Amino acid sequence: MTHPQPFIAVIPARLASTRLPNKPLADVGGKPMVVRVAERAREAGAQQVLVASDTQAVLDAARDHGFDALLTRADHPSGTDRLAEVAARFGWRDDTVVVNVQGDEPLIDPTLVRDVASHLAAHPDCAIATAAHPIHDAADVFNPNVVKVALDARSVAMYFSRAPIPWSRDAYQPHWPDVAAMPAPAFPVYRHIGLYAYRARFLRTYPSLAQAPIEQAEQLEQLRAMWHGERIAVLITERAPEAGVDTPADLARVQALFRPSSK
């Protein structure tokens, strides 16, 4: 009998969203969004679910619903930096698995959260684990808002990019630059899913790592870890995850799913 990998789920949440102000506190079926996310993390089997925020109202919302919460600094440039502060303050052991669950994903699949944590445990040479799913639409391959990942034989990341990787010379070159004429990929192309599991050891070192030129060019913070020699294990899942909440339209869509159906 196998036992699930023990892990801690941390939910970084900040109110300062330009497209959707006060997003973590938005009502989703009678509860704040950040609480809905925390409930999903708890369903995943996390040993501890912790909301990390620089805003007292977010912490109060989490605690009112029975979740742990920690006040963090307001000057963190990324959610990973916020996680690093949490890891340092709690003093977790180096091998503790910490999953970063985005605070704007109330529909995240608990099974995926659990599987990414287990995937990191299965790759002791990796500091990070994440997930990806196959792309079947050429438009997504060429969409810079869709982050792609190229993998080695062990499904460890070789590179993340907004560009179409890998580039199929024979399939794409005859049509370039007419993206609309591009055929669907006939070889594996994977879309990155922004869910991460970290070893606490890495989180404590992350703030001291200098930004990488490729990170600044692509605007992908996971490239900083790779630039400094860390490995990222990638779990392949066949199904695309539910979209997060970035805009008022996204929020309305999610609220409708939590609304009781009228008979």
From Swiss-Prot:
Keyword Metal-binding appears in the UniProt entry: no
Entries under InterPro entries matching the protein: Cytidylyl_trans, KdsB, Nucleotide-diphossugar_trans
GO terms (BP aspect): CMP-keto-3-deoxy-D-manno-octulosonic acid biosynthetic process; lipopolysaccharide biosynthetic process
Family matches, as Pfam families: CTP_transf_3
GO cellular component: cytosol
Pathway: Nucleotide-sugar biosynthesis; CMP-3-deoxy-D-manno-octulosonate biosynthesis; CMP-3-deoxy-D-manno-octulosonate from 3-deoxy-D-manno-octulosonate and CTP: step 1/1; Bacterial outer membrane biogenesis; lipopolysaccharide biosynthesis
Catalytic activity, as annotated: 3-deoxy-alpha-D-manno-oct-2-ulosonate + CTP = CMP-3-deoxy-beta-D-manno-octulosonate + diphosphate
Subcellular location: Cytoplasm
Example GO molecular function: 3-deoxy-manno-octulosonate cytidylyltransferase activity
Key words of the record: Cytoplasm, Lipopolysaccharide biosynthesis, Nucleotidyltransferase, Transferase
Predominant cellular place of this UniProt entry's protein: cytoplasm
CDD domains: CMP-KDO-Synthetase
Enzyme Commission number(s) from the entry: 2.7.7.38
Biological role: Activates KDO (a required 8-carbon sugar) for incorporation into bacterial lipopolysaccharide in Gram-negative bacteria.
PANTHER family reported in the protein's UniProt record: 3-DEOXY-MANNO-OCTULOSONATE CYTIDYLYLTRANSFERASE (PTHR42866), 3-DEOXY-MANNO-OCTULOSONATE CYTIDYLYLTRANSFERASE, MITOCHONDRIAL (PTHR42866:SF2)
Similarity comment: family membership: Belongs to the KdsB family.
Protein name: 3-deoxy-manno-octulosonate cytidylyltransferase
Organism of provenance: Burkholderia vietnamiensis (strain G4 / LMG 22486)
